Amino acid sequence: MTQLEEQLHNVETVRSITMQLEMALTKLKKDMMRGGDAKQYQVWQRESKALESAIAIIHYVAGDLK
């Protein structure tokens, strides 16, 4: 088991990481709603997908320990 997998079996660690990612995603979505040019919007979309993927991976690896 990798160190990351070991950490993700700690419920508090999973909650903390997930909360940080969700807060970043919320901020990003607020920025998207404020608007910007097409290039910036594309960057925000990629960042949003990356954050959503990270959350999904953590839940998968951690066995969804919330």
UniProtKB/Swiss-Prot annotation:
The keyword Membrane does not apply. Belongs to the YscE family. It comes from Yersinia pestis. It is found in: Cytoplasm. The gene is yscE. GO terms for cellular component: cytoplasm. The keyword Ligase does not apply. Component of the heterodimeric YscE-YscG chaperone. The YscE-YscG chaperone forms a stable ternary complex with YscF/SctF. YscE interacts with YscG, but makes very little direct contact with YscF. Homodimer in solution. Coiled coil: none annotated. Keywords: Cytoplasm, Plasmid, Virulence. Chaperone of the type III secretion system (T3SS), also called injectisome, which is used to inject bacterial effector proteins into eukaryotic host cells. Along with YscG, prevents premature polymerization of the YscF/SctF needle protein within the cytoplasm. Is also required for stable expression of cytosolic YscF and for YscF secretion. Likely plays a role in targeting YscF present in the cytosolic YscEFG complex to the T3SS apparatus. Required for Yop secretion. It comes from the Bacteria. This is Type 3 secretion system chaperone YscE. Disruption phenotype: Deletion mutant has no detectable level of YopN secretion, YscF expression or YscEFG assembly, but it expresses normal levels of another Ysc component, YscJ/SctJ. Deletion mutant fails to secrete YopE at 37 degrees Celsius in the presence or absence of calcium. InterPro entries: T3SS_PscE/YscE.
